[in-house]
């Protein structure tokens, strides 16, 4: 819940409140396919990435479906792998599985930040990331990268052999690496080239999600980052959603027509 009052808003307005409602229903592959968010091949590819040690960054704007895709992807981690999630503010992931007798069947730890005015008592995502590395995780889920410290800490976790899945606000797949770089640059005095190389190495796969005009949510593109040379990002588009037409029905409701295709189609 986010609330604003005067003097931020006009006195005659009173209070402005925004409530983020988390859907507690488990996201399934069938639901993602039914909604047209992705194809079966795309979801199987992302599952293989997480299961076999390839870190993934999911990008998009607010309400684009980043958290939904990430929650489903983390739910694909096998029961014998240790999964630790880090979230800021509120819990959105519930990935603990139980068997028919109610016993916990997988190895999952959910961690949450605890802001405090006293720096010694403040528990942020950067602090939790450092602690997580001592717990021998197979997969680390970072709710969202917002600061320089957690941006680089998450990247270094990936570069040291851990599988990381995280989200970030970005306008496209390709611009996601630069967004991560500019976040890290707020605190660390490294060149653009060094930071970009770190991010490309840390997150070989980037997924971009978007909410279209008809309010449907799609994975718009999946790319593989291959390198950064002479100020240019080198990448390969693996899957992409192409919009064929935008229509408006007799009730004034918009409809987007399109399809997912492989990068080499």
Annotate each PLM feature.
Residues 1-52, 97:
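P-loop NTP-binding catalytic core
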